[in-house]
From Swiss-Prot:
This is Methionine aminopeptidase. Monomer. One of its GO terms (cellular component) is cytosol. A divalent metal cation 2 binds at D109, H172, E206, E237. It is an enzyme of class 3 (hydrolase). Its cofactor is Co(2+); Zn(2+); Mn(2+); Fe(2+). CDD domains: MetAP1. Its EC number is 3.4.11.18. It catalyses: Release of N-terminal amino acids, preferentially methionine, from peptides and arylamides. The gene is map.
């Protein structure tokens, strides 16, 4: 039987702290995302901010051999893009920056999309749908519901928008370990999940949405995942705490207003 860790108040407070650090990095990096900058430069800015300003550790660096401190996934890259000096942002790109931090023995993890210059209409719509699919799932969370319901909510919304959901990657429990049980599926194709949400659970929700086919492939570097048909992909991610009222978003960023996005639930 899978052991899901329920956090006590001391653990929750530590996760609130590290969650805020993650949110602060995503707020900080926005001004640097301009045409002409390399993803290597973005990585170095985040690494230095986490290490020297926040006095924390970039959790991605060295994790199962990952060589950088953040993931940078541009356009048709679904996830786990490796920052490098030859990857130069250009006008119209969409980029996901994924930040995970370890502080005082606890982890937090979040990602968001950024526009480089002026985005295409497809890029704008895809990012909006990816963000809203995450928010709809977060709005659904409360103690006593089956975890499977989150995937169903995401799937129903994304399908109506004529986009597709990546099935190979999922959210995860998080706390003293970077990845803990349970797995958080962003679809409802596997209907055997019996996990019931409880107050004190902490996990990530991180749907990856493609503008074309849901099929993906891993490149030769062993990390970078791309859409098979070269269509655009977008992802938003938060670390959350299940509480008696629903959930607390531990990685909420400045000015982020979920209610505004959820006004139109179609």
């Amino acid at each position: 039987m899978t052991c899901i860790f329920i956090k006590n108040i001391n653990e929750i407070n530590k996760m609130r702290l590290v969650g805020k650090l993650v949110a602060d990095v995503l707020d900080m990096i926005k001004e640097y995302i301009v045409p002409g900058i390399t993803t290597e430069e973005l990585n170095n800015i985040c690494h230095n901010y986490i290490t020297y300003k926040q006095h924390a550790k970039p959790a991605c660096l060295g994790y199962q051999g990952f060589p950088k401190s953040i993931c940078t996934s541009i356009n048709d890259i679904v996830c786990h893009g490796i920052p490098n000096k030859n990857s130069i942002l250009k006008n119209g790109d969409i980029i996901n920056i994924d930040v995970a931090i370890l502080k005082d023995k606890y982890y937090s993890d979040a990602s968001k999309m950024f526009f480089v210059g002026k985005p295409t209409e497809l890029g704008k719509k895809l990012c909006y749908v990816a963000k809203k699919s995450l928010y709809l799932a977060l709005y659904t969370i409360r103690p006593g519901i089956n975890l499977q319901k989150l995937g169903k909510v995401i799937q129903n919304y994304v399908k109506k928008q004529n986009f597709s959901i990546v099935k190979e990657y999922c959210g995860h429990g998080i706390g003293r370990s970077f990845h803990e049980p349970p797995q958080i599926l962003h679809h409802n194709y596997y209907k055997s999940n019996t996990t019931i949400l409880q107050s004190g659970m902490t996990f990530t929700v991180e749907p990856m949405i493609n503008s074309g086919s849901c099929e993906v492939q891993c490149t030769n570097d062993g990390w970078t995942v791309k859409t098979k048909d070269k269509s655009l992909s977008a992802q938003y991610e938060h670390t959350i705490l299940v509480n008696e009222e629903g959930c607390e978003i531990l990685t909420l960023q400045k000015g982020e207003q979920i209610s505004r996005i959820l006004k139109n639930l179609t």
